[in-house]
Amino acid sequence: MRMYDLIAKKRDGFSLTNEEIDFVIRGFTNGDIPDYQMSAFLMAVYLRGMTDKETARMTLAMAHSGDMVDLSGIQGVKADKHSTGGVGDKTTLVVAPVVASCGVKIAKMSGRGLGHTGGTVDKMESVPGCRTSLPSEEFIAQVNRIGISVIGQSGNLAPADKKMYALRDVTATIASVPLIASSIMSKKLAAGADCILLDVKTGNGAFMKTLDDSIALARAMVAIGTHNGRKVAALVTDMDTPLGRAVGNSLEVAESMQVLRGCGPADLTTVCRELASNLLMLAGKGTVEECQALFDEAISSGRAFETCKAMFSAQGGDISVLEDGSFRKAKYSHVVKAPRGGWVCSTNTEQIGIASVMLGAGRTRKEDPINFAAGIVLNKKAGDAVQPGEELATLYADDESLFAAAERTFLAAYSFGDEAPALPPLVLARVSESEVERF
């Protein structure tokens, strides 16, 4: 078997066999296939696409290129959720404890933030003392004991994906549905969960900007999971505006605790309710309606909040900050005022995320430090009426000199008008193995 022939085969639009796909991924991972040939192969995939079967096999080969997490020591169904990334997206901190409190095990590996999007691991580490790196034995023991553990990605998960992504990044082959889907799902397959709910963000703050593209990505990832024996579904959710009102690590954790205590922002609560109920349904806990009732009861009884505190406590976190919101505050705050009255018609969510990074809440390079107290709290969002000079948001930072540029970026993200805008639904579609349902 020669890589040259497989490049030509894909270039000409033919499907590759399982053996051929395994040869490509294995050879590239171990260094037998050089970058220049893999670059040509990736461009052929970008231009010609892949069938669901090809994509599923490539994803499995990528997953098996490194460590496969063994969750067999955890009793019962193991569930996971994954978000494609957004601004103010703190849903894991609500959904995971709710689902665990309903009797479904959550053994989850999460990522860090990069660019304008935040990461669950960074948010968790804003709780003083919280460890997000656990030995596998402790990770599994904790899930068996309290039903939940959320940690950072560890070990050598899907090294083929890391090498492939580095090439895609410099060869103009990022925006390919089979390549994006296999990149995400290779790590999900390697992480070992039985049930996976995907939260595919769409809109100006998301990686996928249009609903059709987001549904195509969701459908491809669901097909990958199904072909590889996992129960997978996806919700396509709106990211044309930040989720909730807090953007920044400790600010978002505090807001998540409000949701778990039944007093969080309506939009964040609604999205978390839909995600949790769909994940519970995948795990066999009933219909969506029955699982929505489980969500409501887990919140109203306080059980989900107690589960969340138990997780942070088990991982060394100071749970007093979860109970009373006593996170370290930024040294300085700055109020951004509305330049005119009327209505907030739209927001450029990516720019709001960039403004939070400028304040120190995120990173532009993987090695950048994060200020857990920095960020933005939004007073006005798309669809809100506003008076001239009224507070739009409060910016938080430890360096006053950061406010001027961040405020300019933030204000440029806001569009005002004289009439109330029509807003899209928070959940725009549900994708399962058998259908795509638009809302």
Where are these predicted regions, by residue range?
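Acidic, glycine/proline-rich low-complexity segments that act as flexible tails and inter-domain linkers
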Residues: M1-G88, V259, K309-A314, D318, ...
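Well-ordered secondary-structure scaffolds
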Residues: D5, K10, S15-N18, F28, ...
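Self-splicing inteins and homing endonuclease
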Residues: T59-S83, S136-A166
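Short beta-strand segments
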Residues: M109, V143, I151-S154, I184, ...
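A glycine-rich helix N-cap at a beta->alpha junction
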Residues: K123-S149, R219-G225, G229
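Phosphate/diphosphate-binding glycine-rich loops and adjacent basic-rich segments that engage nucleotide
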Residues: N144-C195
